[in-house]
Amino acid sequence: MKRKNIALIPAAGIGARFGADKPKQYVEIGSKTVLEHTIGIFERHEAVDLTVVVVSPEDTFADKVQTAFPQVRVWKNGGQTRAETVRNGVAKLLEIGLASADDNILVHDAARCCLPSEALTRLIEQAGNAAEGGILAISIADTLKRAEGGQISATVERTSLWQAQTPQLFRAGLLHRALAAENLDGITDEASAVEKLGIRPLLVQGDARNLKLTQPQDAYIVRLLLNAV
């Protein structure tokens, strides 16, 4: 049986650093929200079988998303943290039979709306059949400094450092097990949860265009990238 590829987009955050009057995933860029741009990436990709968006139970914007993408599952069972939101989404996929333990879950930040299709293809091709899973990442190009009290305390050796991106691809069963701990403190992405099990996920070459909309000034770059597509 063919292993399914299921995109899971945690979208329960409030995006406080972005400073808008609504969660950043619902900020409009052009005629669509950031989240709609992100969903479209997966809906257009032939290797993705299903897209699921997990939002907060109090979300008042999700109905528009469901109307725009009636085939997408939009669930209001998000948690207080990203890890909780992903855990809830994976658990429901397994519970209702939309995913088996052996299917691939591709967890992607709602605010990464410029993911190139070729980067997504590369991740699926290189990590889709790997039991340890894998993530998109790019090597660090800039010099990194460690700071104390607003002053440089050290220069960090960057040779072996990579910047994690999303999607992060793991088997549903593995991801469910990795996120099953009651205390998810320190889990900043899915790979870090899997690493705690002693597993070493693959690094797949990402793309600099796959940036995360975090600060207000990022919106300018995102607009340029989306207009260039």
Curated annotation (Swiss-Prot):
Task: Give the organism the record lists.
Answer: Neisseria meningitidis serogroup C (strain 053442)
Known catalytic reactions: 2-C-methyl-D-erythritol 4-phosphate + CTP + H(+) = 4-CDP-2-C-methyl-D-erythritol + diphosphate
Q: What gene makes this protein?
A: ispD
The entry assigns this protein to a family as follows: Belongs to the IspD/TarI cytidylyltransferase family. IspD subfamily.
Q: What class of enzyme is it?
A: transferase
Q: What Enzyme Commission number(s) appear in the record?
A: 2.7.7.60
- UniProt KW keywords: Isoprene biosynthesis, Nucleotidyltransferase, Transferase
Q: Which domain of life is it from?
A: Bacteria
The name of this protein is 2-C-methyl-D-erythritol 4-phosphate cytidylyltransferase
BP GO terms, sorted: isopentenyl diphosphate biosynthetic process, methylerythritol 4-phosphate pathway
Q: By its UniProt entry, which SUPFAM superfamilies does this protein fall under?
A: Nucleotide-diphospho-sugar transferases
PROSITE patterns membership = ISPD
Stored Pfam families? IspD (PF01128)
Biological function: Catalyzes the formation of 4-diphosphocytidyl-2-C-methyl-D-erythritol from CTP and 2-C-methyl-D-erythritol 4-phosphate (MEP).
UniProt keyword Nucleotidyltransferase present:
yes
Pathway recorded for this protein: Isoprenoid biosynthesis; isopentenyl diphosphate biosynthesis via DXP pathway; isopentenyl diphosphate from 1-deoxy-D-xylulose 5-phosphate: step 2/6
* Residues flagged as site, Positions MEP for the nucleophilic attack: R158, K212
NCBIfam families this protein is in?
A: ispD
Q: Return the annotated site residues (Transition state stabilizer).
A: R17, K24
One GO molecular-function annotation for this sequence?
Answer: 2-C-methyl-D-erythritol 4-phosphate cytidylyltransferase activity
